[in-house]
């Protein structure tokens, strides 16, 4: 029972975390911020962010 509840909570958190990223991706911004997709054909990450190889997401990098 506890596992099911945790799975549902984690799934909802993931949906809410990724939905703004999808929305922003469709707006053709000049650079990608946290959790934006990066790589070939995508805009580069903004300042203070780096494209994480393998995940192809912009991750904060000081």
From Swiss-Prot:
<keyword id="KW-0800">Toxin</keyword>
<dbReference type="GO" id="GO:0015459">
    <property type="term" value="F:potassium channel regulator activity"/>
</dbReference>
<keyword id="KW-0872">Ion channel impairing toxin</keyword>
<comment type="similarity">
    <text>Belongs to the neurotoxin 10 (Hwtx-1) family. 33 (Jztx-1) subfamily.</text>
</comment>
<feature type="signal peptide">
    <location>
        <begin position="1"/>
        <end position="21"/>
    </location>
</feature>
<keyword id="KW-0528">Neurotoxin</keyword>
<keyword id="KW-0732">Signal</keyword>
<feature type="propeptide">
    <location>
        <begin position="22"/>
        <end position="29"/>
    </location>
</feature>
<feature type="disulfide bond">
    <location>
        <begin position="31"/>
        <end position="46"/>
    </location>
</feature>
<dbReference type="GO" id="GO:0035792">
    <property type="term" value="C:host cell postsynaptic membrane"/>
</dbReference>
<dbReference type="Pfam" id="PF07740">
    <property type="entry name" value="Toxin_12"/>
</dbReference>
<keyword id="KW-0632">Potassium channel impairing toxin</keyword>
<keyword id="KW-0738">Voltage-gated sodium channel impairing toxin</keyword>
<keyword id="KW-0638">Presynaptic neurotoxin</keyword>
<comment type="function">
    <text>Moderately inhibits voltage-gated sodium channels and weakly inhibits voltage-gated potassium channel. Inhibits the inactivation of rat Nav1.2/SCN2A (IC(50)=870 nM), rat Nav1.3/SCN3A (IC(50)=845 nM), rat Nav1.4/SCN4A (IC(50)=339 nM), human Nav1.5/SCN5A (IC(50)=335 nM) and human Nav1.7/SCN9A sodium channels (IC(50)=348 nM). The toxin delays the inactivation of sodium channels without affecting the activation and steady-state inactivation kinetics in the physiological range of voltages.</text>
</comment>
<feature type="disulfide bond">
    <location>
        <begin position="38"/>
        <end position="51"/>
    </location>
</feature>
<keyword id="KW-1015">Disulfide bond</keyword>
<keyword id="KW-0964">Secreted</keyword>
<protein>
    <recommendedName>
        <fullName>Delta-theraphotoxin-Cg1a 3</fullName>
    </recommendedName>
</protein>
<dbReference type="GO" id="GO:0008200">
    <property type="term" value="F:ion channel inhibitor activity"/>
</dbReference>
<dbReference type="GO" id="GO:0090729">
    <property type="term" value="F:toxin activity"/>
</dbReference>
<dbReference type="GO" id="GO:0005576">
    <property type="term" value="C:extracellular region"/>
</dbReference>
<dbReference type="GO" id="GO:0044231">
    <property type="term" value="C:host cell presynaptic membrane"/>
</dbReference>
<dbReference type="GO" id="GO:0017080">
    <property type="term" value="F:sodium channel regulator activity"/>
</dbReference>
<keyword id="KW-0960">Knottin</keyword>
<dbReference type="InterPro" id="IPR011696">
    <property type="entry name" value="Huwentoxin-1"/>
</dbReference>
<keyword id="KW-0629">Postsynaptic neurotoxin</keyword>
<keyword id="KW-1220">Voltage-gated potassium channel impairing toxin</keyword>
<feature type="disulfide bond">
    <location>
        <begin position="45"/>
        <end position="58"/>
    </location>
</feature>
């Amino acid at each position: 029972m506890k596992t099911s509840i945790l799975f549902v909570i984690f799934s909802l958190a993931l949906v809410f975390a990724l939905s703004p990223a999808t929305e922003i991706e469709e707006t053709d911004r000049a650079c990608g911020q946290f959790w934006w997709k990066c790589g070939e054909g995508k805009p580069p990450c903004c300042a203070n962010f780096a494209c994480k190889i393998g995940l192809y997401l912009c991750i904060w990098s000081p």
